[in-house]
Amino acid sequence: MTKITVVGAGSWGTALAMVLADNGHDVRIWGNRSELMDEINTKHENSRYLPGITLPSTIVAYSSLEEALVDVNVVLLVVPTKAYREVLQDMKKYVAGPTTWIHASKGIEPGTSKRISEVIEEEIPEDLIKDVVVLSGPSHAEEVGLRQATTVTSAAKRMEAAEEVQDLFMNSYFRVYTNPDIVGVELGGALKNIIALAAGITDGLGLGDNAKAALMTRGLTEIARLGRKMGGNPLTFAGLTGMGDLIVTCTSVHSRNWRAGNMLGKGHSLEEVLESMGMVVEGVRTTKAAHELAEKMEVEMPITAALYDVLFNGNNVKDAVGSLMGRVRKHEVEAIPDLL
């Protein structure tokens, strides 16, 4: 039995805490809403973020980060990307020794455009890091909460670390593969949120299956193009954290990025969308970060650029579609010869 603290009591953090508790681990979960932590402890439910799911009674919730981290050497981080540095700066005051830092957040840090594993390594002293591991893949919290079959990937620079995390999570409904490509796994999970927003817009506009299939396929090309430029393995983007996560996020009503895009496609403003969602829509921030990375690294990402103009420059969604369809003619694979 391993002592694990889950930092972040949203839908995904709560669902992963349930998986770990089902596997017999000593699981604690931290959140900054004391009333929510009380509900988890007394009613064994997170009615705000994972309603209708009865959680294992062995999960203990804390609103004090210091108390949640006592005698723990494995932490699972599931917080919004913009909150990572602040949370990590608090955590390092209470972590006692070498710790395995797992993160399951899908995004890029706003402002720096850094991957989350890079942020962890910057903020946490070396003597407090045993390993940094990424857990990512096609996985809706609502389905994991119902214990429906789900498959994800554990990635780390040291394969033994990825395998240790694989063993922590594996059970009859939650299967984990390993991958040494931490860069590709992180980028696949983050960048697919951009395409999910665009897919939602496509559906909101009623453009049909042909357009959505084209968007997803060309979107994957953009993900792989930037990912390869940043050092990711091209094969990773054809796997669970690339194509797999893209499919589930672009086609399901569970996806908050798809839902946000759908509202944009139906004519709502970005402000209206974000206010109505009530939860973080990582794709919005990731679009800005990816657009900045693409310009800096001179990588062609036309879908990302068009979405950036819709979100941040006030462009009309129909005009964005027209601009993409009117681009100069190209061979399908001419832009990614280094991936073949």
Curated annotation (Swiss-Prot):
The keyword Lipid biosynthesis applies. Signal peptide: none annotated. One of its GO terms (molecular function) is NAD binding. It catalyses: sn-glycerol 3-phosphate + NAD(+) = dihydroxyacetone phosphate + NADH + H(+); sn-glycerol 3-phosphate + NADP(+) = dihydroxyacetone phosphate + NADPH + H(+). Transmembrane segments: none annotated. SUPFAM superfamilies: 6-phosphogluconate dehydrogenase C-terminal domain-like, NAD(P)-binding Rossmann-fold domains. GO terms for cellular component: cytosol. The keyword Coiled coil does not apply. Its main location: cytoplasm. InterPro entries: 6-PGluconate_DH-like_C_sf, 6PGD_dom2, G3P_DH_NAD-dep, G3P_DH_NAD-dep_C, G3P_DH_NAD-dep_N, NAD(P)-bd_dom_sf. Catalyzes the reduction of the glycolytic intermediate dihydroxyacetone phosphate (DHAP) to sn-glycerol 3-phosphate (G3P), the key precursor for phospholipid synthesis. This is Glycerol-3-phosphate dehydrogenase [NAD(P)+]. It comes from Bacillus thuringiensis (strain Al Hakam). The gene is gpsA.
